[in-house]
Regions:
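Jelly-roll (double-stranded beta-helix
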Residues: 1-71, 76-295
């Protein structure tokens, strides 16, 4: 199990023009957890503090081949015109669902991105082709305000794409020789969840669970992403199973893992195939995400 505490994680400023000019903004970001697993799962999980004015993070209306989950720690975070995720609420962004344009200029939140077999491209082999892919794109077009503009080789006409999407297409072609395609959306739009409106049920003495939702973006009996909240009383334990990779986080102090008691804002990753257990020295509420399985 990997465990990260917010106050111990490095903060990096993504100043305007950074990230190879793909996204404007001045986000203060902490990379918390990530993996490229043997079963094809790729994810990254990070904490961001958004800033006002010229340092606001902006992006055009767009979509992705990967799935996302966003949770707001404090304030409220925008994801489209008139659309906000308030504190301690979350939104699930299904694969291929359009959202935005967004202006993130306030709030602190968590963002999880995940996909399989090139849907999500982070670290590993993708890191090795990123710089060259951006160089090629800049030779044939321009990045500005989160948009990549170039000339369509088939029609000869000017075209505009989300800058992140353009990079994914270029990287995927470089590694596989194939065209990167975002599938048709199965869900029409992001799904805003209000966890406080769900009720707990008692799963065991001292262990309560809220099931928030299961969402299928892939075929298969275990291909759903599962969202829940666990509440632990002193002396109770919650077990992460072997069959799925999972991440979890808590804003409460007192979470116990093995012989250590952790402070508030603790995050953990339990890879598929590993057993893990958490308990609490005092009552703790833990948000849990169970990753899909495609086999």
């Amino acid at each position: 199990m990997d465990v990260v505490v917010a106050r111990e994680a490095t903060t990096q400023a993504q100043d305007k023009g950074a990230d190879s000019s793909l996204r404007p903004g001045g986000v203060l970001r902490q990379m918390l957890l990530s993996d490229n697993a043997p079963d094809g799962l790729s994810f990254k999980f990070f904490r961001s503090r958004y800033q006002p004015g010229e340092k606001a993070f902006t992006s055009p209306r767009h979509h992705h081949a990967f799935q996302q989950l966003r949770w707001t720690e404090s304030g409220q975070i925008n994801y489209g015109p008139g659309q906000y995720i308030s504190a301690r609420e979350m939104a699930y962004f299904p694969r291929a669902a359009y959202y935005g344009p967004q202006v993130k200029d306030t709030g602190v939140g968590l963002l999880l991105q995940l996909g399989f077999h090139g849907e999500h491209q982070y670290g590993g082999v993708w890191a090795g082709v990123r710089d060259e892919a951006i160089k090629r794109l800049k030779e044939t077009g321009t990045f500005a305000d989160g948009v990549y503009a170039d000339t369509d080789p088939d029609t000869g006409e000017r075209r505009e794409r989300d800058s992140g999407q353009a990079l994914y297409e270029e990287q995927y072609a470089a590694l596989t020789g194939k065209r990167f395609v975002v599938p048709h959306e199965g869900y029409d739009a992001p799904i805003l969840l209000h966890p406080q409106a769900f009720e707990y049920y008692q799963a065991a003495p001292g262990l309560e669970i809220k099931n928030l939702g299961c969402f299928f973006d892939h075929p298969g009996p275990n291909a759903d992403i599962r969202l829940s909240v666990v509440r632990l009383s002193p002396g109770a334990a919650y077990h992460f199973g072997l069959d799925r990779a999972q991440i979890a986080w808590t804003t409460d102090a007192g979470l116990r893992i093995e012989d250590r008691t952790y402070p508030e804002l603790t995050y953990l990753y339990s890879p598929r195939g590993e057993k893990a257990e958490i308990s609490a020295g005092s009552t703790a509420e833990v948000f849990v995400v169970e990753f899909p399985r495609l086999d």
